[in-house]
Amino acid sequence: MEEVDGCAGPNSEAGALTAGALTAGAFAVTAGAGVAGAGVAGVGWCSWCSWCSWCWCSWCSWCWCSWCWCSWCWCSWCWCSWCWCSWCWCSWCWCSWCLSKGWEDRGGLEGCKSCKGWCLCSHCWCWCSWCWCSWCSWCLSKGWEDRGGLEGCKSCKGWCLCSHCRCWSIN
């Protein structure tokens, strides 16, 4: 998966990150390869991300960017307490809860048995029928579409996170 406007998709080869053991919430996450990163290992919670020149939203004190998947918060809750890193971004889904609900991970973000769109499983990185972003003019201006969030893109074949919002698009 190639970069788009500075955004490395989750399966990008742009610097696979091997993080240390991260314990957050009720989950102990040991991250493996498969994360597009800047070479940081085992970083802690922080209100500013040195690999990112801006925060993803003006009302949030936590910085987010595509290079720092593992150790940052998305405002009111934290991805790391589930399984950011390598679980569902990789070629197989490690989340039995997800699979038990009839979801499947075929190469990361390619399929779901029971949904029409994509949504983030609260236990891992499987997507189906849910939207991070109701409107992103920058995203749309680049030819990306937001039809309920994660359903389509005019110009790409894979998935990539928009670096300006939480919209996902095919790249």
Swiss-Prot record:
<protein>
    <recommendedName>
        <fullName>Uncharacterized protein 043R</fullName>
    </recommendedName>
</protein>
<keyword id="KW-0812">Transmembrane</keyword>
<dbReference type="GO" id="GO:0033644">
    <property type="term" value="C:host cell membrane"/>
</dbReference>
<feature type="transmembrane region" description="Helical">
    <location>
        <begin position="25"/>
        <end position="45"/>
    </location>
</feature>
<keyword id="KW-0472">Membrane</keyword>
<dbReference type="GO" id="GO:0016020">
    <property type="term" value="C:membrane"/>
</dbReference>
<keyword id="KW-1133">Transmembrane helix</keyword>
<keyword id="KW-1043">Host membrane</keyword>
